[in-house]
Amino acid sequence: MAADSEPESEVFEITDFTTASEWERFISKVEEVLNDWKLIGNSLGKPLEKGIFTSGTWEEKSDEISFADFKFSVTHHYLVQESTDKEGKDELLEDVVPQSMQDLLGMNNDFPPRAHCLVRWYGLREFVVIAPAAHSDAVLSESKCNLLLSSVSIALGNTGCQVPLFVQIHHKWRRMYVGECQGPGVRTDFEMVHLRKVPNQYTHLSGLLDIFKSKIGCPLTPLPPVSIAIRFTYVLQDWQQYFWPQQPPDIDALVGGEVGGLEFGKLPFGACEDPISELHLATTWPHLTEGIIVDNDVYSDLDPIQAPHWSVRVRKAENPQCLLGDFVTEFFKICRRKESTDEILGRSAFEEEGKETADITHALSKLTEPASVPIHKLSVSNMVHTAKKKIRKHRGVEESPLNNDVLNTILLFLFPDAVSEKPLDGTTSTDNNNPPSESEDYNLYNQFKSAPSDSLTYKLALCLCMINFYHGGLKGVAHLWQEFVLEMRFRWENNFLIPGLASGPPDLRCCLLHQKLQMLNCCIERKKARDEGKKTSASDVTNIYPGDAGKAGDQLVPDNLKETDKEKGEVGKSWDSWSDSEEEFFECLSDTEELKGNGQESGKKGGPKEMANLRPEGRLYQHGKLTLLHNGEPLYIPVTQEPAPMTEDLLEEQSEVLAKLGTSAEGAHLRARMQSACLLSDMESFKAANPGCSLEDFVRWYSPRDYIEEEVIDEKGNVVLKGELSARMKIPSNMWVEAWETAKPIPARRQRRLFDDTREAEKVLHYLAIQKPADLARHLLPCVIHAAVLKVKEEESLENISSVKKIIKQIISHSSKVLHFPNPEDKKLEEIIHQITNVEALIARARSLKAKFGTEKCEQEEEKEDLERFVSCLLEQPEVLVTGAGRGHAGRIIHKLFVNAQRAAAMTPPEEELKRMGSPEERRQNSVSDFPPPAGREFILRTTVPRPAPYSKALPQRMYSVLTKEDFRLAGAFSSDTSFF
């Protein structure tokens, strides 16, 4: 054992080459990040173009490192540029000055309007910043600052990185940075001074030059010339006579009825306050040299009028109150309310109305003793007051959220047919001044799933929006909705069509509420046709109709057939006009007995010969070409029932029911039977109109593709046409064959209705009655957004702003995606409303600037165009150069704005009165300067000198300074030769 332990005792020392201290580990992490980002060596880029800092693309990369438990974020900021040729990259000469040092002397991008503060202060295109990761953390002590700066210096030296590396110190709001840039034998130190108050000796150029020269400490005499760039910024806040032109809407006129009801169909537009709060004028002297200009505590040559460059930017008011945005936002807030109409208004007028008519004896007396009401004496103009009277029975007038004048104006706007003393003639009324239906604006409702801009639904949305904002808020909305629902019931009960709705089945491209109103109109049409009791006989129709091309496509399931109502003879009247008013369900017992007596039950088992003995019924007109196959009689087109119109929620319910039947054979069979109700009805009508017909006859008319004819040669050698059913019609247990065997010869007028208008109308009215204001707002919000977009487009067309056109297209694209979903998210809806408000504010800013610059007052067309272009640039660009500086047309207007503001602030007499004053002495005493003291003064001093010794390499030196009322900052970049020092 002793022998074995001897070698172990010889191992007495282990050399540890790992980075031991936290400081060394931190330096290693910095080097690792620089290597990962490939920031090693010198890569010379192209010279910077003028304005590239603002127009170019800036990108950044970030990583996180830590010093012990203190976390730092490392961020690489760089301007995206085209890479230079490889040959240029390979030429990494030892004496080449790093790119960042060369950028210190660049003059093409002084005072960029929008850039990182280090870009503005030092003119760099690329740099790395190390800053505390947490916003609240800060490097405050001098020792920590020096430790970080030493770490940066070592990391740059070890890696050979030539990109400037900065460390943020002190609190973040102070924007204090120190840093370093290293190259082969050269180094630039970035230093900074930040004070609250400007020292008196440094309030002018001469004092700043003294600092710069002393900091450089150049041993040469005379000192090489210093290049100077100066910018003074003047702020205009008092616009004086240029009042904000927006006029608020006249609410009193609306309430008092002085304005027509059409005002309710118009949305307000514009900002309630001036959306332009300040105008900043920057006067710049870009290339000056020391000795040419004087600026000290006694005298200054820096007159803004004489500045060679003027540029302007406008400061926009933060979130200006905009009428259209407020309207839509307030309406959207209703979507989040939970109250029902009953809770808002108290006891429901709908329930009370139901209690009054609930007495069964009263209902029976209506049936046994009907009172005759001449329709022509019933004035339509009275119906706008009916709903109001019903509500007043249960609620005092003084409790109503809406007063009578407002309510009457709205109802007349929604129902313009109420002005007429004649009942409706059965046509749907629409406005004559609507945009053409082919126009892009009119068809926006397809994209937004709202409603046409001339529809009742669209008008209702606008009225509710205005009521919510001006006349009672949520209570007013609930009141108007209650009135609207009662009006719908009144129209249903009295057979008055609802105006402002397109005829035909519900349009599934529109919102659900619009579909419901269209469904109610369909019910009113059917009920009206039935109640009028118009009857026609098939014999009255002459045989002048052309042959029918067929009813269905090549689908097997009847529900999937193409629009059969078009193919079944649109020229004929609908089946409703054939029905008797007494036959509510078309199942009279006498008819059934008659059918049995006539042997119509034989239709199930008997052949065509037995059916041929039946009396034909329900014929519409004779087919022009076809005859029955078995007896050669002419084939007659029957009167058929129209398919039941459906809204999207009913279609969805039907789809769910069919889907629940499953995929089994029994489920599929049951699903096919449910879908074949319309097919069965048409077969029964066909059998009644064509006694002795066969399934082949029906298929030849209903689905010609399923009857295949081919030429064959008969026994005598003649070419004849022989036909047979298609392969799918011969499939065993075919639904068409089953339906044909089940179908009885019953004309449409005696069939059970496919569409029960009474039941469907009551379902719609119940649906409307139970809608909460929040549900209503959800239904109508697409219409409100649609109206807002149309309003914005209309206002933009007056201003012709290209940037606004692009934003409107984006809003339409975004809205069409969001609103097509059944229940869009609130956040996405808020985004759309916010975008609309931003566009409204943008148009308001354009109008504000046009008013201030007096574009309409320009007599010369060229000057007017220049001003309009200038205003447009102010809206779209962060800073706009004034052509001709203070001597150009725009410059003179800006000068005048400042002069007027100065005189108003000093309470001096106008210019005309100053001219009348006697001596020049008096005029001088009463006059004020044209411009206020500059709000900010910026100086950039540059030179190239050898440092630290006369024989050192001449390197770039730069100092940026900014002086404001409460801020004084110096940012210096001082380079030195490190070859022998």
From Swiss-Prot:
The Rab3 GTPase-activating complex is a heterodimer composed of RAB3GAP1 and RAB3GAP2. The Rab3 GTPase-activating complex interacts with DMXL2. Interacts with LMAN1. Pfam families: Rab3-GAP_cat_C, Rab3-GTPase_cat. GO terms for biological process: brain development; camera-type eye development; establishment of protein localization to endoplasmic reticulum membrane; excitatory postsynaptic potential; face morphogenesis; hypothalamus development; lipid droplet organization; positive regulation of autophagosome assembly. It is found in: Cytoplasm; Endoplasmic reticulum; Golgi apparatus, cis-Golgi network. The modification Phosphoserine is found at S83, S379, S537, S579, S581, S590, S664. The modification Phosphothreonine is found at T908. Its main location: cytoplasm. Belongs to the Rab3-GAP catalytic subunit family. Residues 592-613, 908-937 are annotated as: Disordered. InterPro entries: Rab3GAP1, Rab3GAP1_C, Rab3GAP1_conserved. Keywords: Cataract, Cytoplasm, Disease variant, Endoplasmic reticulum, Golgi apparatus, GTPase activation, Intellectual disability, Phosphoprotein. Residues 912-925 have a biased composition (Basic and acidic residues). It is linked to Warburg micro syndrome 1: A rare, autosomal recessive syndrome characterized by microcephaly, microphthalmia, microcornia, congenital cataracts, optic atrophy, cortical dysplasia, in particular corpus callosum hypoplasia, severe intellectual disability, spastic diplegia, and hypogonadism. Ubiquitous. This is Rab3 GTPase-activating protein catalytic subunit. It comes from the Eukaryota. GO terms for cellular component: cis-Golgi network; cytosol; endoplasmic reticulum membrane; endoplasmic reticulum tubular network; extracellular exosome; Golgi apparatus; lipid droplet; postsynapse. One of its GO terms (molecular function) is guanyl-nucleotide exchange factor activity. Catalytic subunit of the Rab3 GTPase-activating (Rab3GAP) complex composed of RAB3GAP1 and RAB3GAP2, which has GTPase-activating protein (GAP) activity towards various Rab3 subfamily members (RAB3A, RAB3B, RAB3C and RAB3D), RAB5A and RAB43, and guanine nucleotide exchange factor (GEF) activity towards RAB18. As part of the Rab3GAP complex, acts as a GAP for Rab3 proteins by converting active RAB3-GTP to the inactive form RAB3-GDP. Rab3 proteins are involved in regulated exocytosis of neurotransmitters and hormones.
